[in-house]
Amino acid sequence: ALTSLPVATTVGNHAADNANYKYHFYVPNLNNLGDNDIVGGDYYFTYGDVLFMMLNTQDTNSAEHIQFIEKTVAKNANCKWKVVTLHQDIYGSAEHSNEPEIVNLRYALTPTFEKYGVDDVLTGHDHAYSRSKFL
Protein backbone atom coordinates (compact mmCIF):
# COMPACT_ATOMS: atom_id res chain seq x y z
CA ALA A 1 0.00 0.00 0.00
CA LEU A 2 1.12 3.51 -0.73
CA THR A 3 0.79 4.44 2.94
CA SER A 4 3.78 2.24 3.76
CA LEU A 5 6.12 3.92 1.24
CA PRO A 6 7.98 7.20 1.64
CA VAL A 7 6.71 9.76 -0.85
CA ALA A 8 8.18 13.16 -1.71
CA THR A 9 5.76 15.29 -3.66
CA THR A 10 5.94 18.49 -5.65
CA VAL A 11 2.90 20.71 -6.00
CA GLY A 12 1.44 20.87 -9.50
CA ASN A 13 -1.29 22.83 -11.20
CA HIS A 14 -4.01 20.33 -10.25
CA ALA A 15 -3.14 20.46 -6.54
CA ALA A 16 -2.32 24.15 -6.09
CA ASP A 17 -5.85 25.33 -5.40
CA ASN A 18 -6.85 22.46 -3.17
CA ALA A 19 -6.25 22.58 0.59
CA ASN A 20 -6.37 18.76 0.72
CA TYR A 21 -2.77 18.57 -0.53
CA LYS A 22 -1.28 19.64 2.79
CA TYR A 23 -3.44 17.12 4.63
CA HIS A 24 -2.26 14.18 2.52
CA PHE A 25 1.45 14.91 2.19
CA TYR A 26 4.13 15.64 4.77
CA VAL A 27 6.32 18.56 3.73
CA PRO A 28 9.25 19.03 6.15
CA ASN A 29 11.25 22.27 6.45
CA LEU A 30 8.56 24.29 4.70
CA ASN A 31 9.63 27.86 3.91
CA ASN A 32 7.57 30.88 4.79
CA LEU A 33 8.59 33.16 1.93
CA GLY A 34 5.95 35.03 -0.04
CA ASP A 35 2.31 34.20 -0.58
CA ASN A 36 2.72 30.40 -0.86
CA ASP A 37 -0.95 29.88 -1.74
CA ILE A 38 -3.14 27.22 -0.17
CA VAL A 39 -0.69 24.32 -0.25
CA GLY A 40 2.47 26.00 1.03
CA GLY A 41 5.83 26.92 -0.35
CA ASP A 42 9.11 25.23 -1.12
CA TYR A 43 10.47 22.57 1.22
CA TYR A 44 13.51 20.36 1.58
CA PHE A 45 14.74 17.17 3.17
CA THR A 46 17.92 15.15 3.20
CA TYR A 47 18.38 11.45 2.64
CA GLY A 48 21.89 10.26 3.31
CA ASP A 49 24.19 12.76 1.63
CA VAL A 50 21.54 13.95 -0.84
CA LEU A 51 19.72 17.26 -0.43
CA PHE A 52 16.27 17.31 -2.06
CA MET A 53 14.71 20.74 -2.65
CA MET A 54 11.09 20.74 -3.75
CA LEU A 55 10.00 24.00 -5.36
CA ASN A 56 6.36 25.03 -5.51
CA THR A 57 6.60 26.77 -8.87
CA GLN A 58 2.88 27.43 -8.92
CA ASP A 59 4.31 30.50 -7.21
CA THR A 60 6.23 32.04 -10.12
CA ASN A 61 8.19 34.50 -7.95
CA SER A 62 11.69 33.32 -8.84
CA ALA A 63 13.34 35.55 -6.23
CA GLU A 64 11.62 33.57 -3.45
CA HIS A 65 12.78 30.25 -4.90
CA ILE A 66 16.33 31.56 -5.26
CA GLN A 67 16.36 32.78 -1.66
CA PHE A 68 15.07 29.39 -0.52
CA ILE A 69 17.80 27.55 -2.47
CA GLU A 70 20.54 29.83 -1.11
CA LYS A 71 19.45 29.35 2.51
CA THR A 72 18.85 25.62 2.13
CA VAL A 73 22.21 24.88 0.50
CA ALA A 74 23.98 26.93 3.19
CA LYS A 75 22.23 24.95 5.96
CA ASN A 76 23.11 21.63 4.32
CA ALA A 77 26.67 22.25 3.14
CA ASN A 78 27.67 18.68 4.04
CA CYS A 79 25.42 17.13 1.37
CA LYS A 80 27.33 15.75 -1.61
CA TRP A 81 24.41 15.71 -4.05
CA LYS A 82 21.68 18.29 -4.69
CA VAL A 83 18.40 17.45 -6.43
CA VAL A 84 15.64 19.93 -7.26
CA THR A 85 12.09 19.02 -8.21
CA LEU A 86 9.48 21.33 -9.63
CA HIS A 87 6.28 20.74 -11.51
CA GLN A 88 6.75 23.03 -14.49
CA ASP A 89 9.00 21.46 -17.10
CA ILE A 90 11.45 24.32 -17.58
CA TYR A 91 13.84 22.19 -19.67
CA GLY A 92 11.35 20.22 -21.72
CA SER A 93 10.32 20.54 -25.34
CA ALA A 94 6.59 19.85 -25.08
CA GLU A 95 3.73 22.30 -25.52
CA HIS A 96 4.19 24.35 -22.32
CA SER A 97 7.93 24.95 -22.69
CA ASN A 98 7.53 28.30 -24.45
CA GLU A 99 4.89 29.81 -22.17
CA PRO A 100 6.12 33.10 -20.67
CA GLU A 101 6.03 31.94 -17.03
CA ILE A 102 7.97 28.76 -17.91
CA VAL A 103 10.58 30.71 -19.88
CA ASN A 104 10.93 33.20 -17.01
CA LEU A 105 11.46 30.38 -14.50
CA ARG A 106 14.06 28.75 -16.77
CA TYR A 107 16.08 31.96 -17.19
CA ALA A 108 15.83 32.88 -13.50
CA LEU A 109 16.49 29.49 -11.90
CA THR A 110 19.12 27.94 -14.18
CA PRO A 111 21.98 30.25 -13.08
CA THR A 112 21.07 29.54 -9.45
CA PHE A 113 21.14 25.79 -10.05
CA GLU A 114 24.56 26.16 -11.64
CA LYS A 115 25.88 28.47 -8.90
CA TYR A 116 24.89 26.09 -6.10
CA GLY A 117 25.93 22.89 -7.87
CA VAL A 118 22.53 21.29 -8.40
CA ASP A 119 23.16 17.82 -9.83
CA ASP A 120 19.69 16.91 -11.07
CA VAL A 121 16.42 18.71 -11.83
CA LEU A 122 13.26 16.59 -12.02
CA THR A 123 10.11 18.05 -13.56
CA GLY A 124 6.65 16.92 -14.66
CA HIS A 125 3.81 19.04 -16.08
CA ASP A 126 4.07 18.11 -19.77
CA HIS A 127 3.85 14.34 -19.23
CA ALA A 128 6.67 13.87 -21.73
CA TYR A 129 10.09 12.33 -21.17
CA SER A 130 13.14 14.43 -21.91
CA ARG A 131 16.64 14.59 -20.52
CA SER A 132 19.77 16.64 -20.77
CA LYS A 133 23.26 15.49 -21.55
CA PHE A 134 24.92 13.08 -19.12
CA LEU A 135 25.96 14.96 -15.98
Where are the predicted features?
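Active-site-proximal segments of metal-dependent phosphoesterases and phosphodiesterases across multiple
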Residues: 79-121
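Active-site neighborhood of phospho(di)ester-bond hydrolases with catalytic His/Asp-centered motifs
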Residues: 6-13, 56, 83-87, 113-130
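Extended active-site neighborhood of metal-dependent phosphoesterases/phosphodiesterases
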Residues: 1-78, 100-101, 108, 130-135
